[in-house]
Amino acid sequence: MISLLCWNARGQSQMTSVPVETRSTLLSIDRSMSPKAGFRLMDPMKTGVVFTNLLATERHMTNQMLLNGSGVCAGDVDRDGLVDLYFTSLDGPNRLYRNRGQWRFEDITLAAGLDCPESDSTACAFADLDGDADLDLLVHTMYRGLRVFQNNGELNFTEKTQTAGMVAAKGGMSLAVADYDLDGDLDIYVTRYRSEAMMDEVQATVRIKTVGSERSVSHFNNRPTTDPDLRNRFYIDQRGGIGEYGEVDTLYRNLGGFAFEAVDWTDGTFLDDQAQPLSAPPQGLGPCRAIS
């Protein structure tokens, strides 16, 4: 039997009292040769997977970044040969469902220590970060950066974020895991967008500075754009409109022992489209095309 995890999103484009929600749906595949072969919807009351990712109307009406949603990851966390499921949530706790076989799942979130309340979680990934043959967990968030959890091997996880060397950055979106430097352990690449946007601030004010033929945003809401949280945030497009860059992504090199270091964008690891080392972190659409 092959299974597929699908998401069915429903949202409103105008102000209503109904929250945006994303529900989990389990489908199984009928591999017989009958004309009815295909996917079959599994009853959540029988599977035990009843997770819903809710987002309050008042939140997404004032911050459209939250409408990008949240992710789910799958992996065998207890090494029993069955794939378990972890769901991330924006307005509520995350959920870990242990696969008990025969399409039955058990919610073991609290016992595992993985509910991550009030984290505004956006993405997740299972990966063996310490090489002990069990799957650890990464949880990306909108406001709290990347959270790292070590699998203790007994259906329990310990958070290692504070000592792991994670960069305190907002706007977390997705992540990927791979051994980019071929040293035998898994490294982490995290992507970011923004945690808030100018378009959600109805009363926002902008001051433009012109030097020669160059125009730039000098102030935002009466604050200079040299302030750390505003630096390199805005640009003037070819039509004269004001755009915003996303937060810079981060590649974390795994040093072992749940210790990571952020790779410098200009140390020669990353190359541009001319195969030359970057001179500054990329902004806009994401990273360069290659890692040497």
Where are these regions (language model features)?
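Bacterial N-terminal signal peptides
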Residues: 1-6
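Acidic, glycine/proline-rich Ca2+-coordinating loop motifs
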Residues: 8-292
